[in-house]
Amino acid sequence: MLCLSLNSSSTSPPKLPLHHSFSRRGIRSWVRSPCVQRKKLGFWSSPKAVLSAVSGAGSEAGKVEEAEEYDAIVIGSGIGGLVAATQLAVKGARVLVLEKYVIPGGSSGFFQRDGFTFDVGSSVMFGFSDKGNLNLITQALEAVDCKLRTIPDPTTVHFHLPDNLSIRVHREYDMFISELVNYFPHEKEGIRRFYNECWKIFNSLNSLELKSLEEPMYLFGQFFRKPVECLTLAFYLPQNAGDIARKFIKDPQLLSFIDAECFIVSTVKALHTPMINASMVLCDRHFGGINYPVGGVGGIAKALANGLVNKGSKLLYKANVTKILLKDGKAVGVKLSNGREFFAKTVISNATRWDTFGKLLKVEDIPQEEKNFKKIYLKAPSFLSIHMGVKAFVLPPDTDCHHFILEDNWGRLELPYGSIFLSIPTVLDPSLAPEGHHIFHIFTTSSIENWEGLSHKEYEEKKELVADEIITRLEKKLFPGLKDSVVLKEVGTPKTHRRFLARDSGTYGPMPRKVPKGLLGMPFNTTAINGLYCVGDSCFPGQGVIAVAFSGVMCAHRVAADLGFEKKAPVLDAALLRLLGWLRTVA
């Protein structure tokens, strides 16, 4: 087993059985998480406890004892799981995080090849603002005395759409609205009214202290302090972005653009995207902005993991949880693939709901509520990812960092390989690639069914064929000479993401089977199994960096109340949970 040690005197680099070929320099940069202590905010400093991956049977300082009972065990170290774990650790809870892989972060992790540092998933980072209450990444890092340097992105995304519709979503809100109005002058009023509705929701959220919506004392407190804001959110909770947009906008092409905006948020069109989810993203990109962490997105998880250890909790790598242990109907621990068992007062699953209730629990232990969830939501498709190192000459001057490409047909938006999302983080942080080179992160929708039943040879050939088609499209649309500029290429399929991210079918997350009633059907953090909680994109409010961080904050608050680290009102708790359960049944 590999674990994070509190031994700050370790001098030898960890021996990691990586599937990526990390350089020694790369491993050392991972060990020294780029964390700035609050007392030394003017410069980079070494963290108080070095993140060292050591044998579980080795250093006593980092040894994880099976007989030891924790306040909480967290399955998985995605952003949602790490935020929940660190928030609990700060409150005084003893937390054990169990991670299947050898580095933290999940979809927000990283890997290195030949001098290139790649983000595993999205490079579009929200939550780093220094203002408001939705700067959840900043808050999570500050809670464990960490701060990351970031680089502001002047353009959230550059859309390249059918009929030569080319729209930049500028960081400055008025610039974005002006550009959109220039394309659709006849919809000027409708554009402003739709986005004003988004701001109404965002400003309400941003004014509230964000904690668990399953904790009645918090809810009552917020309602009495901010009744208008709370009622605003309650009003929009069952509504979808597409319905709101159609109240103000009639132009079919502009409505298709709103669909593309929402597709980036939720992998579905606006009519299926909850208005609250859409508003968080469509407004925070202008309020707090997109800010890229220096050194890559993986720095977020590294800093949170280091902060967790510094607060006295533990993180165990290569810890593949295969079973949640129940006693008298209560979650009391977990079992690993090697037979080791760990016990805690509560268990928090950062796995998807399909993994949690389809693999980690026996069929007879699955509550009816979770069976109902699967009737409302299905697994969104996975994606094909292409990580490339390219020569710098291929980028035109003033190329934006993020691009969304849908060349010729709006009807292809949701189809496999129909649209392409491209990030070039070296536009912001050149240190991620060798001099004279850039990084391309390319993502497009793909389903695991299209990759099953192939021989190894057929699988590899299909990867190359599909990747070549995607690269050809980018070359034709944006980057002439792209193919000749490629010096490194790694292609990931839904099977890759299922294996390394431990996500059932490699899914991006849940999506509604039919037009949803906003977020009413989305479960929160508690489950029908006593002592078991869920966190991440299978919980309210859904997918995205802000959303899963919000989920982590909410989960930590609810668990802390149940453990006695926060005030609670048992009678009100029971009534509220029954009400929330009933609301999900009418979704």
Swiss-Prot record:
UniProt cofactor(s): NAD(+); NADP(+); FAD
InterPro entries from the UniProt entry: Amino_oxidase (IPR002937), CrtISO (IPR014101), CrtISO-like (IPR045892), FAD/NAD-bd_sf (IPR036188)
Tissue and organ distribution: Up-regulated in the flower buds and flower lip tissue, while it is weakly expressed in leaves.
GO MF assignments: carotenoid isomerase activity; oxidoreductase activity
One Pfam family in the UniProt entry: Amino_oxidase
GO CC aspect terms: chloroplast membrane
Subcellular location: Plastid, Chloroplast membrane
Catalysed reactions listed for this entry: 7,7',9,9'-tetra-cis-lycopene = all-trans-lycopene
Disulfide bonds: none
PANTHER family for this protein: PROLYCOPENE ISOMERASE, CHLOROPLASTIC, PTHR46313
Record's function text: Carotene cis-trans-isomerase that converts 7,9,9'-tri-cis-neurosporene to 9'-cis-neurosporene and 7,9,9',7'-tetra-cis-lycopene (also known as prolycopene) into all-trans-lycopene. Isomerization requires redox-active components, suggesting that isomerization is achieved by a reversible redox reaction acting at specific double bonds. Isomerizes adjacent cis-double bonds at C7 and C9 pairwise into the trans-configuration, but is incapable of isomerizing single cis-double bonds at C9 and C9'.
UniProt similarity note: Belongs to the carotenoid/retinoid oxidoreductase family. CrtISO subfamily.
Name this polypeptide is given: Prolycopene isomerase 2, chloroplastic
Organism: Oncidium hybrid cultivar (Orchid)
Lineage, top ranks: Eukaryota, Viridiplantae, Streptophyta, Embryophyta, Tracheophyta
Name of the coding gene: CRTISO2
